[in-house]
Structures are given as structure tokens and as C-alpha cells.
């Protein structure tokens, strides 16, 4: 892929990476329908990726005048806009418990989306990554768990480890890394996540886990 060449030739560094390969179930194959989706809230970047099918009738429900509207045609972007609207309505970012309220808002949102269809969701902002594991289409064509897999690594001092294949590597001094994917990307011991699991990851570690 040309993207691999770009990553190999440009020394990009970040603490959070979201990558998404889309099987287009809703909307045309266009840039505006390409994940991950990004919005601004509270002066921060919020990023969202979804794997599954939530149907085509998502709406903002009780939100009378939604601030966040989809640019493209996908169910995933419509769901993201709905999540951001609920964060606006329910979270005061200045409160000391804002992180807990964000987690609870995300968990309730994910549970609702799961009732519509497969809802494997990753949402990240301000160094915090939240995810909801559901079900997905497996190799035999059956929709069932697991929808996401987790691998936790500790990179020893000065070590550089390939995430999967070439192009993306994890390096640092005593760095903890958490990798989440639809399927295991390496031969290591990936852990399947139970359906309904909501996890909060920070600095490469799982900080909170709940079932919803």
C-alpha cells in the first residue's frame, strides 16, 4: 500500500493510532465516508471508528437542533455525531469526574447501538481511548463474538517492535502498548474481548473495564 511507504519514509510519532479498512455497507466509496471520523469538542480532537452495521435510520432522537451533522452517508458517522451530541449535553469538562461521566456516556451509547446491529466501536480523545466490543462476521459468514481482540505489550528499553508487518513500529524506553483489532494481527497471545465489554485505555494500559 502507498500508505505503508508514506509511514516508512516519514518519521511520524504519536501515542494513539487509529486505522480502519472499510467494507462499504452504507454510502459510496468516497473520502467523506472514510473512517476514522474526526470532530472538535472542548478544544480537543475526538476520533471515532466503527465496524458493524447499525442500519440506515439513525437520528439524533431528542436533540432538537443538533450541532454535529454527518458529512457523508454512513451509519458510522451518524452514530459518531450522536455520541458527540450526548457528550455535549451530559459532560462538564471542567469537573474532576468528567472522565467517569464520559466513560458512562460512551457505555450507554454503545449498549444502545448494539441493539441496532454489530457495534464494535473505538473512540479516542485527549490521551484516552474507549472501546466497545460486540460481534462481527466471522470466517464462516456467521455474525458472532468476538468483535475485537486485545494485545498488551511491554517494550523493553530501546526495543522496536513491528505492530503487524512493515511500516508501523512501536518504540520507546519501557513503553506499555495496547493493540486492539478486529482479528489478531500477529502470532502473539491476543485476548478475545467478550461481547458488551467496554474498556478504557490510557498510556498503553487498560485502566477500566465493564460489561454493559
Stretches with model-predicted labels:
Residues 1-50, 54-212:
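Conserved short alpha-helical segments that host acidic/polar catalytic motifs at enzyme active sites
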